Every structure is written in structure tokens, then in C-alpha cells.
């Protein structure tokens, strides 16, 4: 059976600011108007993160815009959204977060077979010099690509 995947939004800043240790897939507990806003790609994951309350994980600071065609029964754009994951995955992440230097951030939000999914990652923060190295490598590879195009 093939999987239909429609990427709604990617958190490019997270890939730049952090070193990704491991990724997980989580479902999202959403309201109807939030799903419609996601289908319109009205979402922002820039400063969002995953937090734990008790033994449950929540997506925080993710902005899903209000659905414009919705009536009075609309959602709050930056509410905390519960993540739906297996217990063993939650325990794995929770144990890693107890160690110093680890965080958990969302990488992308997408629809998989019609259901909203969130790819989250266990990450470690990058130092400033690591970010500079990444920029230099990207610039060098861009220059090489452009020179190869010109030489054809």
C-alpha cells in the first residue's frame, strides 16, 4: 500500500540551529478548523518546541492560523496540542531530555494518508562556529554548482 504524503510546513531553522540526534513521527490531536487551516498551509513552526506535562507530550508555540471560513467555533492559534505517540517512544524521549543539552523540536508537519502528522527530533544545540561552518560549506557547494553550470 502506497503512502500519500503532503508536506505542509518544514522548520528549516531547527535544522540550522540544532544537530539532529534522532527523529520520531507523532500524530496530532487537532480540532476541525485546525485541520482545515493546515490544508491551507497556514502554519508556523519557527519557535515551537515539545514539552512534557505528566506523562504526555505537547506541541507548544506552534501557530496554526484561524480558519477564515469558520464560524464562532474557531480554535486558539497558539494553543498547546497533544502529541499522539507510543508509550515506549515517549519514555525514550523523556529519558533523553533528562540528560543535559538535549531538546525536542518539531521538524515538519505533514499529512500522511489523510492524517496530520508531526516529525519531531531529539536535538542538541549547535555552537556558533558550527553554524558558520555550515554556511561556509553551503556557499562553497553553491559556487561549485554555479561554475559547473557555466562550464557546460
Curated annotation (Swiss-Prot):
This protein's GO CC annotations: cytosol
Keyword presence, RNA-binding: yes
Bias type Basic and acidic residues, positions: 132-142
Membrane spanning stretches: none
Localization in the cell: Cytoplasm
Annotated region (Disordered), positions in chain: 132-152
Location (main, coarse): cytoplasm
A Pfam family per the record: SmpB
GO MF: RNA binding
Record bears the keyword Cytoplasm: yes
Keyword terms: Cytoplasm, RNA-binding
Gene Ontology biological-process entries: trans-translation
PANTHER family xref list: SSRA-BINDING PROTEIN, TMRNA-BINDING COMPONENT OF TRANS-TRANSLATION TAGGING COMPLEX
Its job: Required for rescue of stalled ribosomes mediated by trans-translation. Binds to transfer-messenger RNA (tmRNA), required for stable association of tmRNA with ribosomes. tmRNA and SmpB together mimic tRNA shape, replacing the anticodon stem-loop with SmpB. tmRNA is encoded by the ssrA gene; the 2 termini fold to resemble tRNA(Ala) and it encodes a 'tag peptide', a short internal open reading frame. During trans-translation Ala-aminoacylated tmRNA acts like a tRNA, entering the A-site of stalled ribosomes, displacing the stalled mRNA.
Protein family according to the UniProt entry: Belongs to the SmpB family.
HAMAP family assigned to the protein according to its UniProt record, in alphabetical order: SmpB
Name the record gives this protein: SsrA-binding protein
Organism of provenance: Bdellovibrio bacteriovorus (strain ATCC 15356 / DSM 50701 / NCIMB 9529 / HD100)
Lineage: Bacteria, Pseudomonadati, Bdellovibrionota, Bdellovibrionia, Bdellovibrionales
